Amino acid sequence: MALMYPFHVAQPPLNWSEHLWVSEVSPAKESFITTICEHRQAQWDNQDLLRHLQDSVAILTREDQRHVNAVHAAANMPANP
């Protein structure tokens, strides 16, 4: 029964005949809650997309990126005649 109620419902009713005790949700609050849910879903989707990659491929820290850029720049420098 707990799965039937969204997370912003304050307390589920004790009897089926009782009404839900919910504060009125303004359009701004509804938009905020929707944005949070969409952001969480996007994070889960991104994690699923990167799950098959190794950590060394999927995660590059700033230090790794600086090292890659330095090596790439050194390889492209012309040799002195």
From Swiss-Prot:
Protein name: Anaphase-promoting complex subunit emb-1
Tissue: Expressed in germ cells.
SUBUNIT field: The APC/C is probably composed of at least 12 subunits: apc-2, apc-10, apc-11, cdc-26, emb-1, emb-27, emb-30, mat-1, mat-2, mat-3, such-1 and gfi-3.
Keywords annotated in UniProt: Cell cycle, Cell division, Developmental protein, Meiosis, Mitosis, Ubl conjugation pathway
Organismal lineage: Eukaryota, Metazoa, Ecdysozoa, Nematoda, Chromadorea
Signal peptide interval: none
Coiled-coil ranges per UniProt: none
Encoding gene, per UniProt annotation: emb-1
GO cellular component: anaphase-promoting complex
